[in-house]
Each structure stands twice: as C-alpha cells, then as structure tokens.
Amino acid sequence: VYGCGVLLLLSSMFRQALLIRRLRRHSTQERIGRIVLVRPTAQIASFSFFRTIYISRSVAEKDIAAIFAHEKSHVIHRHSLERIVMESLKALLWWNPFAWLAARALTEVEEFEADRDVLAEGHDTGNYLKTIFTQQFGYSPDVADSLSNSLTNSLTKKRIQMMTTPMKSRYALLRLIAMLPIVTGLLAAF
C-alpha cells in the first residue's frame, strides 16, 4: 500500500512535467534576460517552472507586467526547486497529514513572498489585487457583487489580507524560522 501511494504521487509529478514540456513546445517563446516567457494560446493559470514563465495569450495586456513580476519572483527565489523537493517528500510521506500541511504552508509562504516582491517593485496594490482576482476567478472584481462567499478559506483571501494589512511585527520572519525545527520534528515523528 505504501509503495502504491508513493508510485501514484511520483507518477503524477512526472505527468505534470510532461504536460509542461508539451505546453512549452506548442507555444510561442521569447527570451527576456535569463528568463524564457512562454505564451500559450490555451487558457491556463500563469505559472513559472525554473527559468520559464507561462502566461496565457488571453491575459489582458494591462495585467501582464504584474503577473510577470510575480512569476519572476518565483524564478529568482527558486520556488520550483522548493516545490519539487516538497512534492517528493510529500510522496514519500503521503500518509502523514503534516507533510500535506507543510506543503500547503510552503505554497502560502512562496505566494506571500512573490506578492511582496511585486509590491516592492512599485505596482499599485489595488490594481494588483484586481489582477489576482481576475486570474483566480476569471472575471473582474468590479463585476462581483460579493467577495465573501467566493473567498472563504482560500489562499487568495489570505494573500489579499497579507497585502492590505500592515506588518504586525518585525519578528514575523524570526517566528517563521523558529517554527521550522518544530515542523521538521513533527514530520520526523510520523
């Protein structure tokens, strides 16, 4: 049973890598410095994989700069490598709920870090929030009647909260670093 779980998750990772490769092969590509921008005709959520950024041609021109900055942050911080390591650990520890929680927490931290970098580049917070909303839900928040139902318990809601509330403590990063040994110990215990 354990081996089947590991094999299933690792084969899923391999399948995703093949899909990314096929998407890149069937899309237009442009080199921007050390980064390759891939513009597929398929309507996909924007993402990066190592030094390659994928942004659908259906994305509005006004949103491309902020999305590119966000994905460039993922490239600079090597989040693809972190993700592969975490997904591999999750495959090996698939039965451990803490592995799944750690993977979700890593995703949140990576998104918060990328959002921080986008805002540090000088992108307008309000416009960037609209871009995130449009990317996540496929329509502009100007058209939405209520955000509360759509955003309940979502990563998008947490990202919006992180960008719109001031930092509560200088020591937030220190607290996060202090949590690493605890999380590592919990993962090792199971």
Task: For each feature predicted by the language model, list its residue ranges.
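Hydrophobic topogenic segments
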Residues: 1-190
